[in-house]
């Protein structure tokens, strides 16, 4: 590919990636206007709002996948995960959550000495608190449960289909895997908000995109995201629903144990990533060897057919 064509390819990839992010934002605004039109309080029915937003995003991303797929090959890579890959991904998810735990702890320490950081941490905690602007008493319990279910299992599908499937996918058309991972992670971080979120969102985006690349499977990043959300927010959000009457002491103990587990898993997560890197290299070598063997077999078969044809001609001449 010539220089101008390379530049055009890169520019096109960036513009398409930005378009995918615009679609993501526009879907959210569309759901917002629908709720506003029907005068549904988004704060009281936040679970229903977030669920509707995610379902609409998934539908939009399925359309993107269909539009970009060629023949029987899906635009989103959806290889079946092997058991060894699943184990590695679970360890990575725990380590990723441990990294975020350390990030928040460090931010809290900085906030003790820096006023602006203190305000940022207050804003952050309000943004992740389901009931920061609404009393639990006015929220239907079904919506609180739907909020948790959506957070744990639907959000990962919607965000991974957008940022790893679509954004990373179009970036790969113009860039190598490393730069595509970085750019998609930056986009992921920016759309999570330019505050305390952005730092760990970019770091998590790097890990999620890298695991998608290493496994050639969107299931990998979805699994990572699910485990992260379940242990990072889902468990606490479920246990703090007042109508379930779970004592705060039990909730605190569970969350402390989860935090300790994730911190303990961090060094093993590094090893798990190294394992996936080695596993990908092994798969590439194996696929290359199989392709070479298939090519050799095809050449051998063609040679045998040629020899048979020549022998047949010689036999006919003798007759």
Question: What are the functions of these language-model segments?
Answer:
Residues 21-29, 54-63, 93-100, 260-281:
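Hydrophobic core of alpha-helical transmembrane segments in multi-pass integral membrane proteins
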């Amino acid at each position: 590919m010539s220089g101008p064509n390379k530049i055009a390819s890169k520019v096109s990839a960036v513009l398409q990636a930005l378009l995918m992010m615009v679609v993501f934002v526009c879907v959210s605004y569309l759901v917002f206007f629908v709720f506003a039109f029907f005068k549904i309080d988004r704060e009281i029915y936040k679970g229903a709002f977030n669920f509707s937003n995610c379902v609409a995003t998934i539908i939009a991303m399925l359309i993107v996948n269909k539009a970009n797929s060629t023949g029987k090959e899906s635009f989103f890579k959806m290889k079946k995960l092997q058991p060894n890959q699943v184990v590695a991904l679970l360890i990575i998810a725990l380590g990723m959550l441990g990294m975020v735990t350390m990030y928040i702890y460090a931010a809290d320490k900085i906030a003790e000495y820096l006023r602006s950081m203190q305000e940022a941490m207050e804003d952050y905690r309000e943004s992740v608190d389901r009931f920061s602007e609404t009393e639990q008493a006015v929220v239907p319990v079904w919506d609180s449960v739907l909020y948790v279910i959506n957070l744990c299992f639907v959000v990962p599908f919607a965000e991974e289909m957008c940022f790893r499937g679509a954004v990373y996918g179009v970036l790969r058309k113009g860039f190598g895997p490393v730069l595509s991972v970085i750019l998609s992670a930056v986009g992921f971080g920016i759309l999570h908000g330019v505050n305390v979120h952005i730092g760990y969102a970019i770091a998590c985006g790097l890990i999620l995109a890298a695991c998608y690349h290493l496994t050639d499977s969107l299931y990998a990043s979805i699994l990572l995201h699910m485990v992260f959300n379940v242990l990072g927010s889902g468990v606490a959000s479920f246990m703090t629903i007042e109508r379930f009457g779970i004592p705060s002491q039990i909730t605190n103990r569970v969350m402390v144990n989860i935090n300790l587990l994730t911190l303990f898993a961090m060094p093993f997560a590094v090893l798990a990533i190294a394992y996936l890197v080695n596993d990908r290299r092994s798969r590439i070598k194996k696929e290359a060897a199989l392709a070479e063997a298939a090519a050799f077999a095809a050449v051998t078969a063609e040679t045998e057919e040629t020899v048979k044809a020549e022998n047949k001609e010689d036999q006919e001449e003798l007759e």
